[in-house]
Amino acid sequence: MKNLWLCASLVLLLGACAKDDSSQPSTQTAPAVAMGNGKANTWVNLDAQGNPTALGFTLSKGALDQLPATLPGTEYMLALPDAATQKTPFRYVMIDWNPLGHEPAGIYDVPHFDFHFYMMPMAEVMQIPPYAVNPTGFDKVPAAAYLPAGYVRNPGGVPAMGAHWSDVSSPELHGQPFTETFVYGTYNGHVTFWEPMVALSYMRTNPTLEQDIKQPAQYETPGYYPTHFGILAKPDGSYEVSFSNFVKR
């Protein structure tokens, strides 16, 4: 299993955060964790009614530098602010740094990040076994309505993550270099994470990305769900990775 940097303790994952006056549009932030030569921390923007308008994390200047070369990779666990876990289906964020990428060869075997926005408790995620040990949870898939059209399940599954579903229209699956894509995750019949997957080389281009997230027809858990995903390189050398345009489902 990957080296797990429990940079945020279980106490932090219960939702420690900083709050602003809820009578006005506001931002809640969670404690930062060390990453590379910088840090990472999550945040949620709220409207005057306390509902989410954007949710994501900031990678400070230096966070992409001097990342570990340890294989198979390093995981950074980020707490989410209280309002994020109360209003959206997301429980926490796990940043997976893959210095040599991962399978399939020739597509995702380049240095990249898996930005997992998890919908299940961390303790349950950590108990997901290797596929070869017990494939049952991986093979039990949700009803088709809970996944976007055009997504197919990848073979097998990943311990402490689950099964991964890919968008068959993604350019890297049709001979183009991998830059970024959007993955869905499932386990034991439930959608368990939404995952932007982004190449380090693409992050280094200082992108301004804003795109729609392909949506399922139905949502298992009531709450506010994002419809847009973005990456913004800022003048101070930091990056914002965000979900936005939330809709109550």
Please report, for each region that a protein language model flagged, where it lies by residue.
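A general structural signal for short secondary-structure junctions and capping/turn motifs
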Residues: 2, 44-48, 105-109, 230-234
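Bacterial Sec-dependent N-terminal signal peptides
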Residues: 3-34
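N-terminal export/targeting leaders of redox proteins
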Residues: 19, 23-24, 66-68, 104, ...
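Phosphate/adenylate-binding glycine loop and adjacent helical scaffold
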Residues: 24-25, 38, 44
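Short N-terminal edge-element motif at the start of the domain
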Residues: 32-36, 48-111
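Intrinsically disordered, flexible peripheral segments
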Residues: 35-39, 48, 52-63, 122-124, ...
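Histidine-centered catalytic micro-motifs
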Residues: 107-124
